[in-house]
Amino acid sequence: MAKKGKKFQDAAKQVEALKAYAPKEALELVKKIDFAKFDATVETVYKLNVDTKQADQQLRGAVVLPNGTGKEQTVIVFAKGAKAEAAKAAGADVVGDDDLVQRIQDGWLDFDVAIATPDMMGQVGRLGRVLGPKNLMPNPKTGTVTMDVEKAVADSKSGKVTYRTDRDGNVHVPIGKVSFDVDQLLGNLQTINDTIVRLRPASVKGAYVQNVSVASTFGPGVKVDFSQF
């Protein structure tokens, strides 16, 4: 494992490794010890007691953070006719059908969210090898395959984030920027916690949430006492 730099080590010294901090205290500490020269993203990681080989124990979806993400999202929409016009009116950055599919096949990927109406998925499906690995493929589970393109665009522009368990049962979700007030970060973290707890698979035995931490982009993780939510 690569040796961490001095700034990281200095930041890590301010974190009690074995302590689980109250949620607000943990976020205050993340802001305090951040050393990035830009407005770093704050992320939470949930370690869950799930078997991701079991389909019913895989979490995937999307949620709108009450205080946004602090990032301007570039949103594209695959749609035709009236739905294309509705997407444009809702603020989508790029709207198209076969022409947009071809543009992406030609290598254009300068966007953060892709939305599609169901009737476009036959064409959009051809982009699976390109969009899938980047988690950009429209999916009904994340609300990005829908006839309600107005809501999908509005949600994406106002702080919608997606989540999914990785192979080890971890869920990584951005909850804002270091520049956010602590209460803004806390509100977003509470929303993520409520969502994950609500989605506990019925087949999970024993403790469901095993560990929660928060960190800035380059900063050390701070363990959260999730019993205090």
From Swiss-Prot:
The keyword Disulfide bond appears for this protein: no
Domain of life assignment: Bacteria
GO biological process: regulation of translation; translation
Pfam families, per database record: Ribosomal_L1 (PF00687)
Gene Ontology annotations for the cellular component aspect, listed alphabetically: large ribosomal subunit
InterPro entries in UniProt: Ribosom_uL1_bac-type, Ribosomal_uL1, Ribosomal_uL1-like, Ribosomal_uL1/biogenesis, Ribosomal_uL1_3-a/b-sand, Ribosomal_uL1_CS
Molecular function per GO: rRNA binding; structural constituent of ribosome; tRNA binding
Record keywords, A-Z: Repressor, Ribonucleoprotein, Ribosomal protein, RNA-binding, rRNA-binding, Translation regulation, tRNA-binding
UniProt keyword annotation of Repressor present: yes
NCBIfam families: rplA_bact
Subunit description: Part of the 50S ribosomal subunit.
Family: Belongs to the universal ribosomal protein uL1 family.
PANTHER family on file: 54S RIBOSOMAL PROTEIN L1, MITOCHONDRIAL, LARGE RIBOSOMAL SUBUNIT PROTEIN UL1M
Function: Binds directly to 23S rRNA. The L1 stalk is quite mobile in the ribosome, and is involved in E site tRNA release. Protein L1 is also a translational repressor protein, it controls the translation of the L11 operon by binding to its mRNA.
Protein name, entry field: Large ribosomal subunit protein uL1
Species of origin: Pediococcus pentosaceus (strain ATCC 25745 / CCUG 21536 / LMG 10740 / 183-1w)
Organism ancestry: Bacteria, Bacillati, Bacillota, Bacilli, Lactobacillales
